[in-house]
């Protein structure tokens, strides 16, 4: 019983640490934080849609959630030396548990290429019903994007099993699925600070 409790405590402690490291290293920009708030709200909407319109959920999560989220990282997050955490951009990229910028480029390229696959083979080797109109084509695209999202999540999780350990992979998996809830909690005030002209979070290193 004690071992089980210790394992659970270790899991939750690592989840808190992964969340803290992700925030303090990769979310200095108030614009990035605000875009993460938009992304989080989009993903929460997608979670609801998933129960009765899964393909539409994928369209919302990718087109709004992922694009806003990743544009924040690529275009607005500082890439210079991080004096707050005493770490170079290269170091932060190297220690990133999940998808660093390089891995994100690969994932987003795969996502962007899926419409070409659907254009070349509308039924995707017979896995999807041939589209008869624009809505059915978008429905098929949504299912492809679900496959890309689930595949990307499982790929990195299993990769972490071997690069780190099983718990790290499972913690990261849990973190990704619960990030929308946590991001709303963390960044709900970011747009207000941004409207006041604050571009960088001065308290990013404070718990």
Question: PLM features: residue spans?
Answer:
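Alpha-helical transmembrane segments
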Residues: 45, 112-119, 148-156
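Alpha-helical transmembrane segments and their membrane-interface junctions
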Residues: 110-130, 197-207
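C-terminal halves and exits of single transmembrane alpha-helices
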Residues: 99-123, 185-192
